């Protein structure tokens, strides 16, 4: 029975303690994000990387602190459900005029679900649905720190206004030639506008927070004229002389989607009202789910919450069944999907055939490494869930048999909540964006005649371009991973996927290593004919030894694939290439990475990146 009166002072005290816990969390999160500006101004790239890793751990630490306080001060796990119903209602009252209500609701869920039995995970006790609207919260924000600022240039004053817009961010380091950069941005904006009349509402809007990631920061906003809006971003980098430059102007949803890709590290942004940032960014990228925008802003737990709500909504409005995912089955992961839903679900198997030598804990550690690392646009982000329930009726019997065979410890089939509905409960699962596996992408092109030089049909020519594009992108992905100090371990085509933007992304993490932990060697010269003809490895191989020249037999069996690979990426088969980058990283060098095409850059001369394309 839902309470008609709030008469429990204990319930209020518990709610207040949880609100205090959330406010402490967001204060620390925001402080660390705001410090990114100083780290950028002092070119403290290693500090930026450390802060990125540390900030990811903040949420779980604060949840644990709050849970322990509730147990210690209020014996929270011993309180009756009547009290817990009132706790939620008091908490809702505390959210009135709060600037991060959606994050605070999620924090409440994270703490409460550590205390209550799963049968109480319903809207009476936790926030299954949001209770407080996030619309127009920014109407109450300080005039001195709005979510976004507006500028009203004329055709003649656009460059001058752009200069002022950049200076208003108060970066404490000089620009090499801001006037020249502003003139380039102006020219690009005029080209975007085309031959149109400037309307009464012609304006520039920019979000007040700078977006920091890697060695760059980004000014993000819109150019508005009449009924047209042009999303844009301005990357700000260090030039050769240690002075700042605007390196490009990115326009339109596709460029912004690349910048905010799920395969990139999270931004650091100082935000008073994160929902206002998400709403603004969503207006620029309407195809991007809100959960992925929260993730990109470093608010991963909110991203998980919204993803799960979207997933439940999709299940309610679809009828297809979960199935074993298409493609070559993995030795470590059992992968399944729902055809109508653009994600895959990955469960760690209970056992791994030779030559795999790993454990569940080691695999989880690899996935955590990727979560905390700079993914440079080449490693897919993952969402990690525990005790996830699916309707049994929606599971293909073949998939159930596969789970029972390879991951029985991770599977429970029961009426967990006692409501008469049988569920498939997965103890631990990773969820990733679905991509086309690169081996399937290439095979489709082979089947269309792309590797046959005698086939000159239009379909074969398109297929040949597909092969070339896939192989070049694969090599670029490997080089980008090198720049991020990542060695994939298993480099087979099947462990990489193609995104909707045509980028190759790595997604199989159980064998990854830091480049700096590997020893890259040439295969020794055979001592005699017997060694040369031997099918066995006759030389000593250490546990972290890598022989790049041995990649070729596994990757380059097709002559056309080999031709393209050797033309663009032959150095990947040379141990000296890998070893030289290892030594630079060990010496403290941090590579430049660019989430946009090299052709868009105003200052290509400042790059030390070894990749001649975007990442």
UniProtKB/Swiss-Prot annotation:
Q: What is its EC number?
A: 2.7.11.5, 3.1.3.-
Example GO molecular function: phosphoprotein phosphatase activity
Subcellular localization, per the record? Cytoplasm
* Assigned GO CC terms: cytoplasm
Question: Main location per UniProt?
Answer: cytoplasm
Q: Name one Pfam family in it.
A: AceK_regulatory
Which keywords fit this entry according to its UniProt record?
ATP-binding, Cytoplasm, Glyoxylate bypass, Hydrolase, Kinase, Nucleotide-binding, Protein phosphatase, Serine/threonine-protein kinase, Transferase, Tricarboxylic acid cycle
What biological-process GO terms show up in the record? Answer: glucose metabolic process; glyoxylate cycle; tricarboxylic acid cycle
Q: Which InterPro entries match?
A: AceK_kinase (IPR046855), AceK_regulatory (IPR046854), Isocitrate_DH_AceK (IPR010452)
So what does this thing catalyse?
A: L-seryl-[isocitrate dehydrogenase] + ATP = O-phospho-L-seryl-[isocitrate dehydrogenase] + ADP + H(+)
Could you say which residues bind ATP here?
325-331, 346
Q: Does the keyword Transcription regulation apply?
A: no
Q: Which residues form the active site?
A: 381
Q: Which domain of life is it from?
A: Bacteria
- State the protein's purpose: Bifunctional enzyme which can phosphorylate or dephosphorylate isocitrate dehydrogenase (IDH) on a specific serine residue. This is a regulatory mechanism which enables bacteria to bypass the Krebs cycle via the glyoxylate shunt in response to the source of carbon. When bacteria are grown on glucose, IDH is fully active and unphosphorylated, but when grown on acetate or ethanol, the activity of IDH declines drastically concomitant with its phosphorylation.
Q: Which family does it belong to?
A: Belongs to the AceK family.
By what name is this protein known?
Isocitrate dehydrogenase kinase/phosphatase
This protein's encoding gene: aceK
């Amino acid at each position: 029975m839902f309470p008609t009166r709030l008469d429990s002072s204990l319930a209020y005290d518990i709610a207040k303690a949880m609100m205090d816990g959330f406010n402490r969390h967001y204060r620390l999160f925001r402080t660390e994000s705001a410090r990114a500006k100083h780290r950028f101004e002092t070119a403290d790239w290693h500090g930026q990387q450390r802060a990125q890793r540390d900030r990811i751990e903040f949420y779980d630490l604060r949840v644990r602190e709050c849970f322990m306080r509730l147990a210690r001060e209020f014996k929270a796990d011993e309180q009756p459900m009547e009290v817990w119903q009132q706790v939620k209602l008091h908490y809702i009252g505390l959210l009135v005029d709060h600037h991060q209500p959606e994050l605070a609701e999620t924090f409440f869920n994270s703490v409460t679900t550590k205390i209550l039995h799963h049968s109480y995970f319903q809207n009476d006790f936790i926030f299954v649905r949001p209770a407080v609207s996030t619309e127009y919260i920014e109407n109450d924000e300080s005039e001195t720190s709005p979510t976004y600022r507006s500028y009203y240039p004329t055709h003649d004053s656009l460059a001058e206004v752009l200069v002022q817009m950049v200076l208003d961010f108060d970066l404490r380091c000089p620009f090499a030639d801001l006037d020249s950069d502003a003139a380039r941005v102006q020219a690009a904006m005029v080209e975007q506008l085309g031959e149109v009349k400037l309307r009464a509402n012609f304006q520039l809007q920019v979000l007040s927070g700078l977006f920091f990631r890697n060695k760059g920061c980004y000014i993000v906003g819109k150019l508005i004229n009449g009924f047209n809006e042009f999303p844009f971003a301005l990357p700000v980098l260090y030039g050769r002389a240690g002075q700042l430059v605007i390196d490009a102007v990115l326009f339109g949803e596709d460029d912004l989607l690349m910048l905010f890709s799920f395969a990139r590290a999270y931004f650091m942004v100082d935000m008073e009202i994160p929902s206002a940032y998400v709403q603004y960014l969503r207006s620029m990228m309407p195809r991007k789910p809100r959960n992925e925008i929260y993730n990109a802003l470093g608010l991963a737990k909110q991203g998980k919450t919204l993803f799960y709500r979207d997933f439940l909504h999709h299940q309610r409005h679809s009828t297809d069944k979960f199935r074993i995912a298409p493609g070559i089955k993995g030795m470590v992961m059992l992968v399944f999907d729902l055809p109508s839903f653009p994600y895959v679900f990955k469960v760690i198997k209970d056992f791994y055939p030779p030559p795999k030598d790993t454990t569940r804990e080691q695999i989880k550690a690899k996935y955590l490494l990727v979560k905390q690392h700079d993914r440079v646009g080449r490693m897919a982000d993952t969402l990690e869930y525990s005790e996830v329930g699916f309707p049994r009726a929606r599971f293909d019997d073949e998939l159930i048999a596969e789970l029972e065979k390879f991951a029985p410890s991770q599977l429970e089939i029961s009426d967990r909540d006692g409501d008469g509905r049988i569920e498939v409960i997965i103890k631990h699962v990773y969820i990733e964006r679905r991509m086309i596996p690169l081996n399937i992408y290439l095979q489709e092109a082979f089947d269309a005649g792309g590797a046959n030089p005698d086939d000159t049909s239009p379909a074969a020519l398109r297929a040949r371009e597909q092969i070339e594009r896939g192989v070049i992108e694969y090599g670029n992905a490997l080089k980008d991973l090198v720049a991020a100090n990542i060695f994939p371990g298993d480099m087979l085509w099947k462990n990489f996927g193609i995104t909707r933007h045509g980028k190759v992304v790595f997604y199989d993490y159980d064998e990854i290593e830091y480049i700096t932990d590997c020893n890259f060697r040439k295969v020794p010269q055979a001592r005699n004919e017997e060694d040369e003809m031997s099918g066995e490895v006759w030389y000593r191989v250490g546990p972290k030894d890598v022989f790049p020249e041995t990649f070729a037999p596994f990757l380059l069996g097709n002559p056309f694939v080999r031709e393209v690979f050797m033309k663009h990426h032959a150095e990947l088969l040379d141990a000296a290439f890998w070893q030289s980058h290892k030594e630079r990283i060990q010496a403290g060098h941090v590579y430049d990475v660019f989430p946009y095409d090299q052709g868009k850059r105003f200052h290509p001369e400042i790059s030390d990146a070894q990749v001649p394309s975007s990442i």
